[in-house]
């Protein structure tokens, strides 16, 4: 049976998103590195989703999973390269196929992402 989400609950989550974007996320350089664009957010969520689900993901897979309406393939790959330069992700060579390089978030990015999610889900304060 599906859980019914009330308008009040949606309002609460929306307020947490606003507070989170204006406080935690606005001052967290790790999260800011992904830009607050649609494709930047999708890149971040793809990386973190693959990490938490223990499913390796490549830059190409990320680029192919994001609709061209959000950003060009080149823009997506460049943002991933920037995240690597900023030491927010590392690339690990696949053991089964040396041509494949999987993207893995660093501890700093994992910490920032968990802080952001924890705040949005009302698990922690802004401080």
Residue ranges of model-derived segments:
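Amphipathic alpha-helical dimerization/coiled-coil segments
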Residues: 114-127
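Short amphipathic alpha-helical interaction segments
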Residues: 70-85
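N-terminal leader/capping segments at the start of a protein or of a new domain
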Residues: 1-18
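Short acidic, hydrophobic short linear motifs in intrinsically disordered regions
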Residues: 53-66
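Short, cationic-aromatic polyanion-contact patches
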Residues: 94-117
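Short alpha-helical segments that sit at the start of domains
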Residues: 17-46
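Short helix-to-turn junction characteristic of helix-turn-helix DNA-binding domains
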Residues: 47-51
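A short, conserved structural fragment
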Residues: 84-94
């Amino acid at each position: 049976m599906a859980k019914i989400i009330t308008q009040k609950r949606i309002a609460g989550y929306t307020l947490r998103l606003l507070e989170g974007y204006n406080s935690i996320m606005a001052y967290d350089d790790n999260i800011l590195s992904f830009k607050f664009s649609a494709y930047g957010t999708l890149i971040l969520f793809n990386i973190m989703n693959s990490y938490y689900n223990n499913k390796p993901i490549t830059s190409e897979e990320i680029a192919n999973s994001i609709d061209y309406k959000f950003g060009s393939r080149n823009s997506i790959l460049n943002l991933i390269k920037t995240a690597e330069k900023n030491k927010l992700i590392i690339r690990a060579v696949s053991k089964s196929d040396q041509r494949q390089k999987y993207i893995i978030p660093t501890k700093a990015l994992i910490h920032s992402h968990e802080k952001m999610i924890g705040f949005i889900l009302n698990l922690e304060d802004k401080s």
